[in-house]
Amino acid sequence: MCEEGETYCPEVKDAKQGKSLGKICMKCKESSAALLIRAGDAFCKSCFKEYFVHKFRATLGKNRVIYPGEKVLLAYSGGPSSSAMVRQVQEGLSRDAPKKLRFVPGILFIDEGTACGMSWEERQQILSEICSVLQQTKIPFHIVSLEQVFSLPGSVLQRGAPEQRPNYKEEVDRFLVQEREQGDAGCSEMLERLEVTDSDSPGSSDKMYQSTCSHPPDMHTQKLKQLFASAKTLTAKQQLLHTLRSHLILHIARTCGYSKVMTGESCTRLSIRLLSNVSLGRGAFLPLDTGFCDSRYGDVDIIRPMREYSSKEIAYYNRFFNVSPIFIPALDTKASENSSIQHLTEVFVNRLQADFPSTVSTLYRTSEKLNVSKIDADQETCAKDRCLLCLSPLDTQAGKASAFSATQLSHHLSQKIPMKSNDLANNSDKSCCQGGQGCKEAGYGDTCQSRALQTPSFVHMLCYSCRLTVKDMQSLDVLPQYVLHEAEHRCHRTEMRKEIQEFLLDEDDGDS
């Protein structure tokens, strides 16, 4: 009878360890294996590079989203995945590439040091490393600070009109003909055209589009600190940071003429996001948040070309081919496991993956089967049907017997708020201190101006997940002005539509 903790046969342990040694590459069948991705998938160094490059090109090729000559913005964070993505694009533009990439790239790095509690000296040290790395790529780049969100226009929260593109194959053939007529213009000429285009763009004189990031205004830095200090939980802070980052990337892409944005989310990262977003109430938007192409913004598409790579594959590639990521502290750096929903999900998935290697791939295959439901064309272009913060289609148009309505009813009862059929939207101009009642007596807490007047007016413009984020904020006065202005603009449009509603024709009447 075997007992726990005893080792009767140490040679058996050595035999098991020796099984993975001396394997032959599964592809070329000649060279010795240098790495083992999965059980039975042993690669030599050269075959692994060929496998890695082919997967990147195949991901872009089979989706046919990026057209030849199109300007693509690479969202670079300094992490392993985005660093590998930049290297893939850099090598794909070279003359020696067998299947050369034919789009015009640019790189964007956003400095989030203020949100993470870093000093300006620490941020400068990181920015100098970022500049040295990006200068070696020979690709035009932009470095901006997160404080720039306080100077964004309200139009960034408006969905742009999607561009009507011709047939992909016809566009490729036309580009190849032009390339032959011009004498096979190489990558260097494409990059030169990009530099000229960026220098002639309207925003090139702005600090936002310079290759180096200057010190942001102290007023914006203080506002950003107050904004993140108002979020009571780390979960809300991470969601808020993701939202502001998306707005800034979208604005820069539109201003500089980029129609596509590449992000570096890996298969592992998207698997974690799949579970965490369900926990955060974003289950309706999983195809947008985890799919290859996110077209919620209309005129700018978010592309995820690294979504088929696991974090293990990316780590091997960076290690073998001298891709040096830059460590930048994040909001959840050195945080406990239970500090946020996102961090807890990450720890949970990584532990499962260590014991069950098919965990990430199973989650990834599940996300691939999710599709966006077809939305009516009028809803697609109507601003009031989209979330004010994440620009996703609103998921709050549910019936009285839905789980969402039950949650709203429970919230009203717990706060001792009289429930009405028209929900919170009609309470936007009311105060909790009416009829001689105080804030505490009405169930709103100690403050009424920031919560009772502003929160209800925001609620009906947000999706369920963004409502939870706003609910965890102590005050809405610290939000950037472009968010407040767009909310006011939507309210005015809604009131105007109500005033002229009786003069409008129904869709059925218009068709007849």
UniProtKB/Swiss-Prot annotation:
The keyword tRNA processing applies. One of its GO terms (cellular component) is cytosol. GO terms for molecular function: nucleotidyltransferase activity; sulfurtransferase activity; tRNA binding. GO terms for biological process: protein urmylation; tRNA thio-modification; tRNA wobble position uridine thiolation; tRNA wobble uridine modification. The keyword Transmembrane does not apply. InterPro entries: CTU2 (IPR019407), Rossmann-like_a/b/a_fold (IPR014729). Pathway: tRNA modification; 5-methoxycarbonylmethyl-2-thiouridine-tRNA biosynthesis. It is found in: Cytoplasm. Keywords: Cytoplasm, tRNA processing. It comes from the Eukaryota. Plays a central role in 2-thiolation of mcm(5)S(2)U at tRNA wobble positions of tRNA(Lys), tRNA(Glu) and tRNA(Gln). May act by forming a heterodimer with ctu1/atpbd3 that ligates sulfur from thiocarboxylated urm1 onto the uridine of tRNAs at wobble position. Belongs to the CTU2/NCS2 family. This is Cytoplasmic tRNA 2-thiolation protein 2-A.
